[in-house]
Amino acid sequence: MQAYFVLSSVCSNFALMIYPSNFENKIQFSEIRSLLKGYCLSQLGKDKVDAMGFTDNAERINTALKQTREFRRMQEETDDFPLQFFFDMRESIKRIRIEGTHLEENEIFDLRRSLETVAGIVRFLNRSDDDGNFDYPTLHDLTEGVLTFPDLIRRIDQILDKYGKIKDTASPRLAEIRSQLRKAEGSVSRTLYSILHAAQSEGLVDKDVTPTLRDGRLVVPIAPAMKRRIKGMVHDESSTGKTVFVEPTEVVEANNRIRELEADRRREIIVILTEFTKLVRPHVDDIVNAYRMLAEVDFIRARAEFAQLTGGIEPEVSAKPVVDWITAKHPLLWLPPGKAGKTHPCSASAMSR
């Protein structure tokens, strides 16, 4: 029978003495870590790879092997396991423990999608047969104590659109501000085009010129020699000096109003983000716990992919000091052609004396 090394190292809560101290380097374990991290979907899994170490706890090793075995079986049996949106939101979530802080728009979007993944994984791993036997019992254990957050997801959907941007309807105040802003911008645009067309008719401005933005204000590009022909304020000039950007007097006040409305919009968005964050704050510990599950799933998936890559089989592990390897090979030597060197099979057998 041929046996292969298979990755079964798990994080240990105690320091296991390894001799020699550079044992990992000698067996090129850093390369295994690198390969594993390449299979991770997020920093969540990569941190687990970095943290893993050797252990002599047979129960932990066998649990890790069962997890890998079940994940490989799942990959063969189904393709609907949730693997999208493994976002690492741990630092963002921990940050909002402090009163007065708030999540940003993009953070809420990533939170929504990753919480959806958490809920999907919990649903998937809770599948069972008619007798109540879970399809993947060891993986199911990962969901114990993991909460899902349908109310938070629903609230996010009320705030953000499908692109992760704040909706007009996120609050009545925001809807009103954005409505006023659109009207003000439309009015400025119409006035500018009217001034521009008149200037083009008089030959002051080229026919292909259109209004542009400078420092958040709509302006008209014009040749320096003609700038006094249009009453207004010069805001900028091009790097070549051949164009200046004039804000006509007729739109200065309207542009000021636009800036005020933009400031109002930002303040209202901060109110919305702050109010939502208040809903999240009581659940910080439970959300962080959910991300621990995502990290474990990411790590297990990486192990399953590595086992597939190297053709690994599941070894038998007992708590007894027994080593019985038959034609064993280092897993790196089972990489596809071109990725590995010459194989050096070995056999070893040792029993406690």
Label each PLM-derived region with a short phrase.
Residues 2-4:
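Low-complexity, intrinsically disordered or signal/transmembrane-proximal segments
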Residues 6, 10-173, 177, 283-286, ...:
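Conserved amphipathic alpha-helical "coupling/scaffold" segments
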Residues 32, 207, 216, 220-237, ...:
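Gly/Lys-enriched N-terminal cap/neck module of very large, oligomeric protein machines
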Residues 97-104, 126-131, 193-209, 302-313, ...:
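Active-site phosphate-binding and catalytic loops of NTP-dependent enzymes
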Residues 148-164, 253-274:
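Extended, charged coiled-coil "arm/hinge" scaffolds of SMC/Rad50-like chromosome-maintenance ATPases
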Residues 176-226:
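Extended, Lys/Arg-enriched charged tracts that mediate electrostatic binding to polyanionic substrates
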Residues 220-221, 289-353:
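Conserved NTPase motor "head" modules and their coupling/switch loops across ABC/AAA+ ATPases, GTPases
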Residues 262-296:
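Non-transmembrane, heptad-repeat alpha-helical coiled-coil rod segments
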